[in-house]
């Protein structure tokens, strides 16, 4: 029966023309068989494909969220590591500054100690030379005194001669 005839029979049946129950039953049975076949062969596999697709999409979303969380964790760890590195660099720089100051102070202290040592050595040498010079002068004065005394003993001299003699010996001592 063509589709137009089936439609006409329903329309006519509704209009009071009578329903062909055989056709209706065959149509309902055919429709039920078609639904059962669609459910078994099309709807089930289609539903499985749709469910699998839904699971895949949900899994992909979960993986994307997990990847996003991991990326955020890594970013936070990187920021923390960067901060720690910057803090470490600052600490190292501060330690270097402190060490440089200490070395500077030590160098100055050592230089002062050396300078003071050199000054003390120089003063000691100056004092030694001064004492030697005074000893030499005393020796020369002693020698002159002995010489003058021996000459005085050998001859009696006047005051004028004595002054000339002392001046002469002092001049000789100054030349030595």
Swiss-Prot record:
Q: Record keywords: Mitochondrion included?
A: no
**Which residue ranges run through the membrane?**
18-38
Q: Where in the cell is it found?
A: Cell membrane
Q: Which UniProt keywords apply?
A: ATP synthesis, Cell membrane, CF(0), Hydrogen ion transport, Ion transport, Membrane, Transmembrane, Transmembrane helix, Transport
GO molecular function term, any single one: proton-transporting ATP synthase activity, rotational mechanism
Protein task: F(1)F(0) ATP synthase produces ATP from ADP in the presence of a proton or sodium gradient. F-type ATPases consist of two structural domains, F(1) containing the extramembraneous catalytic core and F(0) containing the membrane proton channel, linked together by a central stalk and a peripheral stalk. During catalysis, ATP synthesis in the catalytic domain of F(1) is coupled via a rotary mechanism of the central stalk subunits to proton translocation.
Subunit-level organization:
F-type ATPases have 2 components, F(1) - the catalytic core - and F(0) - the membrane proton channel. F(1) has five subunits: alpha(3), beta(3), gamma(1), delta(1), epsilon(1). F(0) has three main subunits: a(1), b(2) and c(10-14). The alpha and beta chains form an alternating ring which encloses part of the gamma chain. F(1) is attached to F(0) by a central stalk formed by the gamma and epsilon chains, while a peripheral stalk is formed by the delta and b chains.
Q: Protein name, please?
A: ATP synthase subunit b
Q: Which organism is it from?
A: Staphylococcus haemolyticus (strain JCSC1435)
């Amino acid at each position: 029966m063509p589709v137009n005839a089936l439609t006409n029979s329903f329309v006519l049946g509704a209009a009071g023309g009578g329903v062909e129950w055989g056709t209706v039953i065959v149509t309902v049975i055919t429709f039920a068989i078609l639904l059962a076949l669609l459910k078994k062969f099309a709807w089930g596999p289609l539903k499985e494909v749709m469910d699998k697709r839904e699971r895949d999409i949900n899994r992909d979303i979960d993986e994307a969220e997990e990847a996003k969380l991991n990326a955020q964790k890594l970013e936070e760890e990187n920021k923390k590591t960067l901060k720690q590195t910057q803090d470490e660099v600052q600490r190292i720089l501060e330690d270097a500054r402190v060490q440089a100051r200490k070395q500077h102070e030590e160098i100055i202290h050592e230089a002062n100690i050396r300078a003071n040592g050199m000054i003390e050595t120089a003063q000691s040498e100056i004092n030694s030379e001064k004492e030697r010079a005074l000893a030499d002068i005393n020796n020369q004065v002693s020698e002159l005194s002995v010489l003058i005394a021996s000459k005085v003993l050998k001859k009696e001299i006047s005051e004028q001669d004595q002054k000339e003699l002392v001046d002469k010996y002092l001049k000789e001592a100054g030349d030595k």
